[in-house]
Swiss-Prot record:
It comes from the Bacteria. Its EC number is 2.7.7.18. This is Probable nicotinate-nucleotide adenylyltransferase. It catalyses: nicotinate beta-D-ribonucleotide + ATP + H(+) = deamido-NAD(+) + diphosphate. Catalyzes the reversible adenylation of nicotinate mononucleotide (NaMN) to nicotinic acid adenine dinucleotide (NaAD). Signal peptide: none annotated. The lineage of its organism: Bacteria, Pseudomonadati, Pseudomonadota, Gammaproteobacteria, Alteromonadales. It comes from Shewanella amazonensis (strain ATCC BAA-1098 / SB2B). Keywords: ATP-binding, NAD, Nucleotide-binding, Nucleotidyltransferase, Pyridine nucleotide biosynthesis, Transferase. GO terms for molecular function: ATP binding; nicotinate-nucleotide adenylyltransferase activity. InterPro entries: Cyt_trans-like, NadD/NMNAT, Rossmann-like_a/b/a_fold. GO terms for biological process: NAD biosynthetic process. Belongs to the NadD family. The gene is nadD. Pathway: Cofactor biosynthesis; NAD(+) biosynthesis; deamido-NAD(+) from nicotinate D-ribonucleotide: step 1/1.
């Protein structure tokens, strides 16, 4: 059995609009949970995403979709700290709040390679390494070139062991996972065109979308 490096709980975090949540979110997280001995995963829906113009479904509808998803997949839990804000959801502020609320946890913020490549444009991005570890998942069409600015960050911080880091923050873990070429935009387009989406979203999410007539 892979040992835990300390007595704290190790929790994966995935933020996003989840508009709607889909297998492109879920399958990489399930792979991450299989690869490392993380004990749970929290989904963090944004209220006001800082890098997007807004959302299509209401906060209430997105909350219901995520709540249904978490009932279908018990490894996931809803964390609504960002959804309750009336200001842009900057990741660094969320992590500061979570570290204060849950000092007994070590957080692993999960992102795609596309997000990691632009991490140096995030608000106070360097402070993230004081607050959490990063788990970077492959995304179709995105590779980290040797001369990219984030290559040095990865070289200095990459954790390559099978066990979790002994530190509470500061490492980058590269997840060798199944790439998922699924986007919320594609799903909304399919719904608007009355096409079937059940290969793209969990059954629980599809039921909420159908019951509420979302994205029509």
């Amino acid at each position: 059995m892979t040992k835990q490096p300390n007595a704290k709980r190790h929790t994966a975090l995935l933020g996003g609009t989840f508009d709607p949540p889909h297998f492109g979110h879920i399958r990489p997280l399930l792979d991450v949970l299989k690869h490392w001995p993380l004990q749970d995963c929290w989904l963090l829906p944004n209220h006001i995403p800082p890098h997007k113009p807004g959302t299509h479904a209401s906060p209430k509808a997105r909350l219901e979709m995520i709540d249904a998803l978490c009932r279908e997949f018990p490894a996931f839990s809803l964390c609504d700290v960002e959804l309750r804000r009336d200001e842009p959801s900057y990741t660094v502020n969320t992590l500061r709040q979570l570290r204060e609320l849950y000092p007994d946890r070590v957080f692993y913020f999960v992102m795609g390679m596309d997000s990691f490549l632009s991490l140096d444009k995030w608000f106070e991005w360097q402070q993230l390494f004081e607050l959490c570890h990063l788990v970077v998942c492959a995304r179709p069409g995105y590779q980290l070139a040797a001369d990219h600015g984030m290559a040095e960050v990865l070289a200095n911080r990459q954790h390559t062991e099978a066990d979790l880091p002994a530190e509470d923050s500061g490492k980058v873990l590269i997840a060798d996972i199944r790439e998922q070429d699924i986007s919320s935009t594609d799903i909304r387009t399919a719904l608007a065109e009355r096409r079937d989406i059940r290969q793209l979203v969990p059954e629980s999410v599809a039921r909420v979308i159908e019951t509420q007539g979302l994205y029509r």
